[in-house]
């Protein structure tokens, strides 16, 4: 017997609308560690949808560091950084990150979402407007909404569009962009945006969640790739759950900005610090990223990207202009993207379909992500499978058009 529900009609209607549009999201449970050869519902797959770009999430050195730090400092942070939750592993990680990136200070946050909410809501308000890229991550948009600041979004990657929006404001504000865009994989024109912010005396903030660890000299991300520093890029946000293979986030900035954020960034002030064990594991990850092994992993990832693009450019799809680990194939229709994703699963490839509202309407896609942990054979399997599925779909479409 079906139990009576007190769920509001508008909730049920919203869910039904998502179902009708093939946009329902669901959780998938892995039965294995975060590795390329994964197991889902007792089925074996080669996964191409993780953000573990360097393959460090299951690295034995990180596991050992996490265990050792937990033995010494426990598992829980216990409190916010400002009460009694800032332990020695947190301090060591902050100092190491600051030294690596060339900033005066680093502040740890529990998630990248919280870092962006904290920084933006503290620095912008009704009198300090925000101008940001139209394809920025949701957390950057939500930070602006939380700040209740005037928000204008410029055309993707278009510095001239950003210039026009900044010129409309008499007051100084905050210019924000992703470093690497999470759904397209392209890199923002950071040098030009930095110059624009400096020209108009605006603050400049970059979220380099998908660049740090993978790009630039010593893995220092878009900062190094674009030749920027702590002066030309005064507020840098990085996440630790991607190339670092752990969890959490940080803000790299000046002493003055860090002191200000310590007072006014509410998601920093009013939340428990990340686990000290995670901080210890992340420090081990940073050491790996800076080592010869880290460079070898970046080189292997770059080879995978080159091979993938060479193979896929011969298929009946348009490649996006990305030279990063994120290699999307835009399908367009949500239902078609789901069908292709399901067909790939039958060939042992796990690659999720990304649909609106995560991406703009009409641009549903396969968000393929590559990792240094993938083998050459994994890449061959992926490209062979894509060729089989996409070619068959094109032939079927031609048959339907002939009828």
Swiss-Prot record:
Keywords: Biotin biosynthesis, Pyridoxal phosphate, Transferase. Pyridoxal 5'-phosphate binds at residues 112-113, 182, 210, 239. Substrate binds at residues 25, 137, 358. Its cofactor is pyridoxal 5'-phosphate. PROSITE patterns: AA_TRANSFER_CLASS_2. It catalyses: 6-carboxyhexanoyl-[ACP] + L-alanine + H(+) = (8S)-8-amino-7-oxononanoate + holo-[ACP] + CO2. One of its GO terms (biological process) is biotin biosynthetic process. CDD domains: KBL_like (cd06454). GO terms for molecular function: 8-amino-7-oxononanoate synthase activity; pyridoxal phosphate binding. It is an enzyme of class 2 (transferase). Pathway: Cofactor biosynthesis; biotin biosynthesis. Pfam families: Aminotran_1_2. The modification N6-(pyridoxal phosphate)lysine is found at residue 242. Its EC number is 2.3.1.47. Catalyzes the decarboxylative condensation of pimeloyl-[acyl-carrier protein] and L-alanine to produce 8-amino-7-oxononanoate (AON), [acyl-carrier protein], and carbon dioxide. HAMAP family: BioF_aminotrans_2 (MF_01693). Homodimer. PANTHER family: 8-AMINO-7-OXONONANOATE SYNTHASE (PTHR13693:SF100), CLASS II AMINOTRANSFERASE/8-AMINO-7-OXONONANOATE SYNTHASE (PTHR13693). Belongs to the class-II pyridoxal-phosphate-dependent aminotransferase family. BioF subfamily. This is 8-amino-7-oxononanoate synthase. The gene is bioF.
